[in-house]
Structures are given as structure tokens and as C-alpha cells.
Amino acid sequence: MAPRKDFEDKATVPIQPVPGKRGYEFGGPLGAFVFIFGLSTLIYCLTFLCNDVSGCPVPSLLNPSTLSLDKLKEEAGWPQEGLKAFFDVRVTVWVLSYYVLSLVLYVFLPGEVVEGTELACKGRLRYKFNALPSAILILGGLALGTYMHGADFVVWTFLWDNYVQIITANLIICVVLAIFVYARSFSIPAPGQPNPELRELAPGGHSGNALYDFFIGRELNPRVQLPIPFVDEASRTIDINVWCEMRPGLLGWIILNLSNIARQYRTYGYITNSIVLSTVFQTFYVLDALYMEPAVLTTMDVIMDGFGYMLSFGHLVWVPFIYNIQTRYLAVFPLELRLREILLILAVTGAGYAIFRGANNQKNRFRRDPSDPRMMHIKYIQTSSGSKLMISGWWGLARHINYLGDWLMSWSYSLPTGIAGYTIIESINSSGDMQKQAIQTPEVRGWGMIFTYFFLVYFGALLIHREGRDEEKCKSKYGTDWERYTSIVRSRIIPGIY
């Protein structure tokens, strides 16, 4: 266990500065309303409209002239109890148990304690990082259960059979957490008051409109301290934003992928290379993020964005239940890839990872220690604010070159699904039993890509939006120095194109 460290020098208590302010984003209050209700509805729609009952997409969507609500509900597998069936107390308790397990591992496993970037009040928060060993322990337990019980291991069957109820449980948790953090943000010290806990309002989160501020997040880096006296301060202090970003959602994404593999095996008696490939790439991305966990401290989510419904929903609901759509599709439609298709996917992924990790490592090393021998070849602009802007290496190619790598890697999640689309047909097997089979017909071929490539389109749009926010922030921070920088590094994300 790491030695106990205080979060601030007792001799000097930071004073709360006047918080910065930013204009509306995401369409302001109206956009916040649409996002809050629209995105959760979208997740349920994607789940029901690409299924193992009638097909992906459901047949009625391809025949709008004969579309009826009753037929659509039948093909989507809509429960007879209606919305009431979306919630189950037992499922919610088990989902909460998963969160508690993740919290217990955070508190009691040893971890690295790292200081974050400097805050507006001139202090620095400290963070404990042990998400990787926590994930390894949980995945190890699942591996043991699978070894003993195979694809019928209770976790795998539970996740597939109660998928909608699990979405609802996570949605409830995300809403409750967002309400708690929003209400608690009103106890942040006023400007000019002592601020020993280093609590701050997020620049974009105190517009005065309650709905918008709830959505975007009022407090920057909200934290709670657990009443556990026999562990050090870092272990009992939970940074809600970082904890949610790096733990339940990310690992939940991979666990759902593994349950989809188990479902494919239970149904067909074998596992296809496509579902393995997609899962391996996604797992590698997650484990790499957990291994590089301290790098999260330099991301916009941590240094600029408040924690509100947007991040709570994104971390706990959107990531696990949108990002596993590809393997969920392949669990029903067992596609085998040819060698040349596999090589193409490997090439795209390798290029993306080289750009993503190389650029981020270079940025982190340069920020920590510009005199690092590995950084001696890097050219930079010295700004009037004291910061240095790299104009060579990866960051001389484009101002957000890491976003290009991130997006290229995301192709490897969707490409294994191919030209997606299937229909479920029923037939009688040799034993006289009714069986369902997923087949691809010319009528549905390609339409399934709306689902399996949705992540790719969404992620590209997200990165472009983030790049735009980065640009506005840097223009405001660096002024004429930023103009000089952009005249040297002209490309935004894709060198020579955008």
C-alpha cells in the first residue's frame, strides 16, 4: 500500500478563483433535452431493431409500405409486458454488485499515485491508478468460470438473456450519479473563499440553465471520500469522472463482447474468426488504455469538462452498449473471413495504433519533461503563456494527429462484420425440432451496416467535434501564438486533407 499523502500543503490553502465561462455547446438547453432523452432511446432502438428474433434490420423496416406498429413490435421481440419488462430488480442488484466489486478493487489493490495537471486555483489533485490489475482480476475470474462451465457459465447466459434490463440498470445508475453530482456542485466555495479540497466549476457548466448544466456538468473533477479509516487518502478518494471513465464501462464493454462469443458458441457449436478478431482488437484497445491510465489526466474530459449527465451516460451506458454492437451482430450471424480480409483489417489497425500511441506518447513525454533525450529532436514554438507547442514529429503532421489514429483503429471493430445484414428463418431440423437460422439475402445485404458501422460514423463525428472544441480553446488560450502555430501546422486531423 502506498504511503499516506495529504492532498495539499497545510500551510497554504488555495483560494477559489473566479471561474471561467464558456458559451453553449451541443445546441444549448434544447440540444441537452434531445441528447438526454434521444440517446437513451437510440440505444434501445438499436438493440431491438437488430436482433435474433427476425433479423438485422427487422424485415418491416425494409418494407415501409406494409409497416405496422404491431408487426414491428413482433419482429423486434418487444416484450408482452411492454416497458415494465425493461426493468428487473434482480438484474439491477447484480449490476450494482459489479460496480461495488470494481470499487472494492480500486480501494484495496495497490496502485500508482499521480498528480494531475494544475488547476485554476493553482493546486493539483492526486489520482490513484490500478484499473489494469483490477481488470485482470475480474477477467481472470471470468476465465476460471468459463473453464469450469464453458459457454454456459452463468455470467455469459445472464448477460445475453437480460441485455435490455442490464441497459436499464446502467441507465438508472448514470442518472442517479448525475443528479448527485449536480446537486453537490452547489456546495463549491464561492470565488475568493478558501478552497482546501480544490473543487472548481467547469468553464462550460455554470450557464445558469439547470437542464443544460445538469447535462454538461457543473463541477470539474467531482470527488467523494469513502469513510474507510484504515486505507490511505488516495485509496479512499474517488474521482467520479476518472473512475467511471476507466472502470465499469470500459471493462463492461469487453465483458459483453465475451458474452457474445459465448452465445455464438452455444448456438452454433463453434466460434468464427470474425468475432474473435473484432473482440481482440477492442480488448487490446481497452487494456492499452488501462495500461496507460495516467494519460487520461491530459484529456479534455478531465481538464475541461464537468461531470454531468453527458459523461455519466457516455461512460456507463453509451460505451458498453454501443461499442459491443459488432460482436452482438456476429454472435447471431457467424461470418468467416478470408485471409486477405484479415490482412486488410490488420494493416488498418496497425497503422492506426502506430499513429495513436506514437503521438500520445510523444505528447505526454514532452509535457512531462521537454529535456527528455527522446524529445531533443522535437521543434516547438514557445508561447507567451509559457507553454510549448510542438511543430515537428507526429504533431508537426497535424494538430490532432492522434484522432486520426484513434479513428483508424475503430475500423477494426466494424470491418469484421463485412457487408452486414441477415434475416432469421425458421425450419424443422432432422430431429423434428424448430430451429432458427440467420441467412443473408440480397434484400438485406448491406442494410445491417447501419448498425455495425454506426460506431464508426459516430466516432468520426465525435472526434471532429472534439477537434473543434480544442481549436476554440487553444485560440482563446494562445491568441496570436496559435495563429503562428496553425500557419506552420496547417492540417487539423488528416495531413494534407483536413
Swiss-Prot record:
InterPro entries: ERG24_DHCR-like, Sterol_reductase_CS
Listed transmembrane segments: 30-50, 91-111, 136-156, 163-183, 275-295, 302-322, 339-359, 444-464
Localization annotation: Endoplasmic reticulum membrane
Superkingdom of source: Eukaryota
Keywords annotated in UniProt: Endoplasmic reticulum, Glycoprotein, Lipid biosynthesis, Lipid metabolism, Membrane, NADP, Oxidoreductase, Steroid biosynthesis, Steroid metabolism, Sterol biosynthesis, Sterol metabolism, Transmembrane, Transmembrane helix
Glycan-carrying positions: 257, 429
Pathway in which the depicted protein is active: Steroid metabolism; ergosterol biosynthesis
GO biological process annotation, one example: ergosterol biosynthetic process
Binding, NADP(+): 363, 367, 395, 402-403, 470, 474-478, 485
Topological category with respect to the lipid bilayer: Multi-pass membrane protein
Purpose of the protein: Delta(14)-sterol reductase; part of the third module of ergosterol biosynthesis pathway that includes the late steps of the pathway. Catalyzes the reduction of the C14=C15 double bond within 4,4,24-trimethyl ergosta-8,14,24(28)-trienolto produce 4,4-dimethylfecosterol. The third module or late pathway involves the ergosterol synthesis itself through consecutive reactions that mainly occur in the endoplasmic reticulum (ER) membrane. Firstly, the squalene synthase erg9 catalyzes the condensation of 2 farnesyl pyrophosphate moieties to form squalene, which is the precursor of all steroids.
Entry similarity comment: Belongs to the ERG4/ERG24 family.
UniProt protein name: Delta(14)-sterol reductase erg24A
Origin species: Aspergillus fumigatus (strain ATCC MYA-4609 / CBS 101355 / FGSC A1100 / Af293) (Neosartorya fumigata)
Organism phylogeny: Eukaryota, Fungi, Dikarya, Ascomycota, Pezizomycotina
